[in-house]
A protein has these predicted regions:
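Glycine- and acidic-residue-biased ligand/ion/polar-headgroup-sensing regions
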Residues: 70-72, 78-84, 89-111
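A short glycine-rich, His/Asp/Glu-containing loop-to-beta-strand
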Residues: 40-44, 61-84
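Alpha-helical bundle regulatory/interaction domains
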Residues: 2-60, 65, 108-268
Length: 269
């Protein structure tokens, strides 16, 4: 059964960038291919390494509007075709200890997440663990992306390592429910009081865990041996980045365990 295409408002024209908690991170609806895409690449640095096909095609168009929920961020994004990638260097550079949940309103991608093949179409919701590697090739798209701390979601599922690369079919009940919730967060993001943002995100994490539970059971675990090799490579990249940072700041009084934890987004055991 084909997935439904989820209606999407025009982002660049209607985004209330002056409202509290709403920030326009990037906008390039017209312009030279190289200059526009370079701005886009810088806006995503630390989250994804991005590249465009060699032939370039039409001038690059894209936009990101972010809604700040304190410990989480949700964005509305539209852009042209490109490749998204996270390898050990990207992971070490960004230091993100988060999950990324994406609803594709229009367009989609084909890709892989540490050996798990992915195919996302309009209406689908996918999930990435940002401590792990992935690569996707997307056509022109519009999506909603939620950046959620690991500490909110991981305790709610039995095997959080199995979340990476899961796709929730947009034609299913759980897929439709989660898609509607993500769209509601975008629509009401500017109106949510900061004092309510934490409980809202806790409830959102619970909904994500519930909606993906059956998808986890059907998909089964990822290739344990291959995933372990990749995770060891990522760990080594992060440790290398930490060693370089320590060497460069040995004489600084601000070089403390807490400073390292904050910079590299790690927690005490």
């Amino acid at each position: 059964m084909p997935n439904p295409s989820v209606p999407d408002p025009e982002l660049s024209a209607a985004a209330p960038t002056q409202a509290a908690g709403v920030v326009r991170l990037f906008g390039a609806d017209v312009g030279a291919h190289d200059a526009a895409f370079e701005g886009w690449r810088l806006a995503l640095d630390g989250v994804f390494d991005v590249s465009r096909p060699r032939d370039g095609g039409d001038p690059f168009r894209g936009g990101i509007v972010a809604h700040d929920f304190g410990q989480a961020v949700i964005t509305e994004t539209h852009a042209g075709n490109q490749r998204f990638r996270r390898d050990g260097r990207t992971i070490a550079r960004g230091g993100l200890d988060h999950f990324l949940v994406q609803l594709y309103r229009q367009g989609g991608f084909d890709g892989e997440a540490e050996g798990r093949e992915m195919a996302v179409r309009p209406g689908d919701v996918c999930l990435f663990d940002l401590s792990r590697t992935m690569q996707t090739d997307a056509g022109q798209f519009r999506n909603v992306t939620l950046l959620l701390p690991r500490a909110l979601l991981a305790p709610l599922v039995d095997t959080p390592d199995d979340l990476h690369g899961l796709v929730l079919d947009g034609s299913t009940g759980p897929g439709r429910i989660l898609a509607a919730h993500l769209q509601s967060l975008v629509a009401q993001g500017a109106l949510i009081d900061p004092a309510d943002a934490g409980p809202v995100m806790e409830g959102t994490a619970g909904l994500i865990a519930g909606c993906f539970r059956r998808a986890m059971a059907l998909a089964g675990p990822t290739d344990g041996e291959a995933a372990q090799v990749v995770r060891h490579g990522v760990r080594d990249a992060v440790l290398g980045a930490m060693h370089r940072f320590i060497d460069a700041n040995l004489t600084s009084p601000e070089l403390t365990p807490d400073a390292l934890m904050q910079r590299f987004h790690i927690s005490r055991p």
